[in-house]
Each structure stands twice: as structure tokens, then as C-alpha cells.
Regions:
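A membrane-periplasm/extracellular boundary helix in multi-pass inner-membrane enzymes
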Residues: 123-132, 140, 196-202, 206-210, ...
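TM-adjacent membrane-interface loops and short helices in multi-pass inner/ER membrane proteins
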Residues: 155, 271-311, 317-331
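Alpha-solenoid helical repeat scaffolds
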Residues: 452, 481-485, 524-528, 558-565, ...
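Hydrophobic alpha-helical transmembrane segments
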Residues: 64-71, 96, 105-141, 154, ...
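Hydrophobic transmembrane alpha-helices and their immediate junctions
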Residues: 326-366, 537
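Helix-loop-helix junctions and helix-breaking kinks within/between transmembrane helices
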Residues: 16-27, 77, 154-157, 188-220, ...
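Transmembrane signal-anchor hairpin modules in multi-pass inner-membrane enzymes, especially those
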Residues: 1-88, 92-116, 172-188, 215-239, ...
Length: 611
């Protein structure tokens, strides 16, 4: 049952846009919580149940506790809570998988399941690439990803993150695994399909990371006498095929030639985002700005070269330092170090000695080697992207970590702990707490999300929208986004000239202020409050709210535009023109509304030539 729940959670997360949307992640969270409940039952019903608790478990538990403490101190509680729930979901998945799925057969099942699923998604990605389809399961994924394979993910880079973890596992088993000929052929085709899918993502970071993982696997196998020729042949084949495809495919050549993502002089590029993340960490070196607070605080740190609002730093290491500080990063780093030490020790133990007369194959060795190299590839990709913050990829990585840690029992018996007193009650309390939090949150945020999405689908400013958003607010009054949308609904109704528009504007102003209190780093509630007051002629009262928006977003082109709009409403077109020009300068292509208003001002100031 636990294996089915874990497989369902992993598979659904991969298929459902990587689990990035709240409505899909809640299902994943519920499945993981249910698996913890089943484990809790097993702890008390299986008489000889033992707990597998190697040293890395203490580091995992310590970081989970640290995340709880930091969440209680966070400036934006709702955002921090959502991040905490993700961390607790991964923590639960790790402990459940480690203590219930440590058999070799379960590792083989999950390997085939994930590799098979990724292979099917590569065919879907090939369709996206060949037809220039820009949708995922019928939903638009954005113009920037046209003619790139992303499978069931929105971003091709994150699909590459999944593939780079699984290709080394499949390749190691094909070359050196103890497997029947038919299975070797099928898995070989899967490996080739995933390699093709990785190429079609056009993710340069994915190519480098995937190549790194494959290189580690094949070099490790080439050092083993029994696998040397097969590994060297694989290296030669991959180099020949890869070079031929790259030289004959224009889209691959074009992607290699375009490198603006790392150009420090270009706008909206990774170096610009990394600079902001670095400064954020320097200002909060020990504790960071808070769980998942990078996006909330980014506007204060960006330069006029960056008009985008990235959710993450496009570098998991900088993102971790910015969010968690040195203390949190040290806990995460300790976890990875303990895992690496244990994994390498296990690898040495499960490796078979070279045979004198025949090749000795080992499924344990190939899985451990492939999974280690796949995780190394993911860590390499983390220097230029945020795959560890994509739930599906994070969960696959956690599952591999748990399975590898479970294989440590082949290296030592030190990790086993009897489930007698006091361990059984203690671990039961931990599992009960994790399962209880996840199941409660699934129900609680499930209700909120249902009402909120209903409000999003309704017509702007309609009674239906306001009723749905109020219902969501009643369930969860900490969500600044709900308050923001309620304010916007009342503002739209007021600006439509509805009866009592002044009271509606004041109602909107009140909701915007609630949103600003819940998330003081978002400029939108501030300048929307000012717009409501401008609408009813209270220009002097509106000015402080635009100042507040500018304080939290000093280089934002949308904020600059709204300040210009305020000056225009106040009867100062000269000041408005200055802010519209500033807005235009803060982004490329220039902000279209600012250009429109600037043309209107210049047209009105130009005297009629007459004839």
C-alpha cells in the first residue's frame, strides 16, 4: 500500500505540471500524508518492526525543525507556511520511503516506473518540439518555450532536471545491471529516448548537467574491468551520435550560439538576479530573509536592468542562502555531506569484485552508482536553475536519497534501531505530527483553494467573484493575495461607475491595506490604495501610498508608471512625464502603458500647427 501511495504521489507530481500549482500539490501532499498514516499503523501492528535511522536522518529532522522555527518568525506568514508544508512533505516522503521501501525490489519497481513515465513524456516532448505546440495538457506554457520540449512540465529546464536524474540510473543498469536481455533492450531504448528528450528541451544547463552525470557513470564503470569495454563503447557511441545530431540540427546550433542568459550586460539575465540574491544574503547573512521570501524581497534589490519578477534566484545555492542564511544552508549542506559519505561507502560495499572467468553484474551496484550520479547531475544543474524548488523534481530526488540511504544496510548494521520503548513512542509522535499536519493542511488549504479558484474564474467585480473570495478569506485570513483580489474586485466595481462608487472605492482601499499588512513587500496593494483615493479626488491622501510602493519597489517599471499616473490625476503632467520616462527606461521592450500615456501628454502639449 505504501509503495502504491508513494508511486502515485511521484507520478502525479511529474504529470501535473511538476506539482508547482497549489491545486495539484495538495493531492500530492495528501498521498504522502496517507502513506505516513499507513506507516504509523505498521509501527504498532508489525511485531518485529525495526526503524532504519542512519546519521543523515538527524540532519533531515534538524532542518525540518529549523524550518518550523523560521516559519513562526517570517514576515509573510502565508508564503512561509506554504514553503514549510513542502519541506514537511519531502521530510515525510524521505522517512516513509527509507523505512518501508528499502528492499531491492521496491527500488527496481520505482526505477522502472519513473523511467517508463519519463520516456512516455519524452514522446510528448518530441510532439511539442516538432509541431511548435505551446501547450501542456491543453494549457498555455508561455511564448518563450515555443519549439522546446517540456513534457508535462511548463518549463523545459525543469523537464531536463527530471531526465538528468534518471538517465544515469537507466544507463548504469543497461551497461552493468543484472537484468534479463529483454529488459536490457527495453531499458536501453528508454535511455535513448530520454537522451533525445533532454536534447529537445534545448536546456543548456540540462545538457551540461546531464552530460556530467553520464560522464560520471561511464567513467566509474570504465574503471571496472568487467564493464570497461561496454562503458567505453557507450562513451564513443554517445559522442558520435551527439556530435552528429548537434551538427545537423539548426535549432540545437542556434541554442548553443545564444548565450544572453549569462551575459552580465543584458537585461533580465541570471547574473542580474544572482547579484540581487547575493546582496539579499549579505544583508541577512545568518538567518536569511525567510522561507520562500526571495520573491517577496526581490523588488527591493533589483536594479533598473531587471524588470521581471522571478519567483526563484535561478541558483538553488544562492536561493538557499538568501532564504535560510548561513545557519539554514549549513543544515542542508550537512545533510548532503552525510548522504554523500554514506552513499560512497555503500557503493564500495555493493560493488562486486572483478571475476576471473565471467562478468559479474550487480543490480545493487548499478542502482547506487546511477542514483548517485543522477543526483550529482541535479546538483550541478542547481548552479543555473531551481530544480530543487520544483516539487516533482524535489520529490524524485528525495525518493532517490531515501532508497540510497536504505541500501546502507548492505554496508553496515549500525543504522537499525529497535522499535521498542522508547523508540516506538518517540517515532510515533514524529510520524503522527507529520501526518497530522499534512492531512489537516490538505483539507484546510483545499477548501481555501477551491473558493479562491472559483473567484478567479468569475467575472471581475461580479457578486459571484466577491462571494467566492470572501469564502476563501473566511477559511484563510492570512493570504495577502486573497485580500488583494478582493480589493481589486471592489475597485473594478467602483470604477465602472456603480451606485455608491465612493463607498466601493473606500471598501477596495480597506482590502488593499489588509493585503499590505499581510505582505508589506508587495507594491501593488500600496499603489492600488492610492489609485482608489485618486479616483474619489483625495489626491493628497493618496500620495503616501505611492511613496510606500516606491520604497519597496524602487526600480519597478510598473510602480513608476503608477506614480506617473498619480501625478497626472493630480494635475501635474510634467512630473507625470518624468515618471513615465523612467518606467520606459526600466524595461525592454518598453512598458507599453507608459509609452501610451507619454504620447498622450506630448500630443496635448504640442500646439496645433493649423493650415
Amino acid at each position: 500500500v505504501i509503495l502504491g501511495l508513494v508511486a502515485a504521489a511521484l507520478g502525479f507530481a511529474v504529470l501535473a505540471f511538476g506539482g508547482v500549482r497549489i491545486q495539484e500539490f495538495l493531492i500530492v501532499e495528501g498521498l504522502v500524508g496517507a502513506s505516513a498514516v499507513i506507516w504509523l499503523i505498521r509501527i504498532w501492528t508489525v511485531r518485529d518492526h525495526r526503524l532504519l535511522w542512519p546519521p543523515v536522518c538527524w540532519a533531515v529532522l534538524a532542518f525540518a525543525g529549523w524550518a518550523v522555527w523560521r516559519t513562526l518568525q517570517a514576515d509573510v506568514q502565508y508564503v512561509a507556511w506554504a514553503e514549510l508544508i513542502r519541506i514537511l512533505t519531502y521530510t515525510t516522503l524521505f522517512f516513509v520511503s527509507l523505512n518501508n521501501l528499502h528492499r531491492q525490489s521496491t527500488a527496481q519497481f520505482l526505477t522502472w516506473f519513473l523511467v517508463g513515465l519519463a520516456t512516455l513524456l519524452c514522446f510528448y516532448g518530441a510532439y511539442q518540439f516538432a509541431t511548435s505546440s505551446n501547450t501542456v495538457w491543453g494549457l498555455d506554457r508561455g511564448e518563450g518555450y515555443t519549439h522546446r520540449a517540456s513534457g508535462s512540465y511548463v518549463c523545459p529546464n525543469h523537464f531536463a532536471g527530471l531526465l538528468e536524474m534518471l538517465i544515469p540510473v537507466a544507463l548504469a543498469i543497461v551497461v552493468a545491471g543484472r537484468i534479463k536481455p529483454l529488459g536490457r533492450i527495453l531499458l536501453g531504448y528508454c535511455a535513448l529516448a530520454m537522451l533525445a528528450g533532454l536534447a529537445l528541451t534545448l536546456s543548456r544547463g540540462g545538457w551540461i548537467a546531464g552530460g556530467f552525470g553520464i560522464f560520471l557513470v561511464l567513467v566509474a564503470l570504465a574503471r571496472h574491468r568487467d564493464y570497461r569495454w561496454a562503458a567505453l563503447a557507450s562513451i564513443a557511441l554517445l559522442l558520435i551520435v551527439g556530435g552528429t545530431v548537434a551538427s545537423k540540427t539548426r535549432s540545437l546550433q542556434k541554442r548553443l550560439a545564444v548565450a544572453d542568459d549569462l551575459n552580465p550586460q543584458a537585461r533580465n539575465t541570471r547574473p542580474m538576479i544572482w547579484s540581487a540574491a547575493t546582496q539579499m544574503w549579505r544583508d541577512h547573512p545568518w538567518l536569511g530573509v525567510g522561507p520562500a521570501h526571495f520573491a517577496e524581497r526581490f523588488k527591493q534589490y533589483r536594479t533598473h536592468w531587471v524588470y521581471a519578477e522571478p519567483e526563484r534566484a535561478h541558483n538553488d545555492y544562492l536561493d538557499g542562502l538568501a532564504d535560510w542564511g548561513i545557519a539554514g544552508a549549513a543544515l542542508v549542506g550537512t545533510t548532503w555531506v552525510l548522504f554523500a559519505v554514506g552513499g560512497l561507502r555503500t557503493l564500495r560495499q555493493v560493488r562486486r569484485d572483478p571475476g576471473n572467468l565471467e562478468t559479474k553484474r550487480s543490480s545493487r551496484y548499478t542502482f547506487v552508482l546511477g542514483a548517485l550520479c543522477g543526483l550529482a547531475a541535479l546538483l550541478a544543474h542547481s548552479f543555473t536553475d531551481f530544480n530543487l524548488h520544483i516539487p516533482a523534481n524535489a520529490m524524485v530526488a528525495v525518493a532517490l536519497l531515501a532508497l540510497l540511504t536504505g541500501f546502507s544496510r548492505y554496508a553496515t548494521d549500525d543504522g537499525w534501531v529497535s522499535s521498542k520503548v522508547p523508540w516506538r513512542p518517540l517515532i510515533s509522535v514524529v510520524v503522527m505530527a507529520l501526518a497530522g499536519v499534512l492531512m489537516w493542511d490538505t483539507w484546510h488549504r483545499g477548501q481555501e483553494t477551491s473558493h479562491f479558484l472559483k473567484g478567479r474564474r468569475a467575472r471581475d467585480g461580479s457578486n459571484e467573484q466577491i462571494e467566492a473570495l470572501l469564502a476563501a478569506w473566511k477559511v484563510e485570513p492570512r493570504n495577502a493575495i486573497t485580500a488583494l483580489y478582493l480589493g481589486e474586485a471592489y475597485r473594478v466595481r467602483s470604477w465602472a461607475g456603480a451606485e455608491g462608487f465612493e463607498k466601493l472605492a473606500e471598501e477596495a482601499h480597506g482590502w488593499f491595506q489588509r493585503a499590505a499588512l499581510l505582505n508589506p513587500y508587495n507594491p501593488i496593494p500600496h499603489f492600488r490604495s492610492g489609485m482608489c483615493l485618486d479616483w474619489i479626488g483625495r489626491h493628497d491622501d493618496a500620495a503616501p501610498f505611492y511613496d510606500a510602493a516606491l520604497k519597496v519597489d524602487p526600480q519597478g517599471r510598473i510602480t513608476s508608471f503608477h506614480i506617473g499616473w498619480h501625478h497626472l490625476q493630480s494635475g501635474d503632467p510634467i512630473k507625470a512625464r518624468e515618471w513615465f520616462l523612467r518606467s520606459i527606461d526600466q524595461g525592454y521592450p518598453p512598458y507599453a502603458p507608459a509609452e501610451t500615456y507619454l504620447r498622450l501628454i506630448d500630443r496635448d502639449r504640442t500646439p496645433s500647427s493649423g493650415r
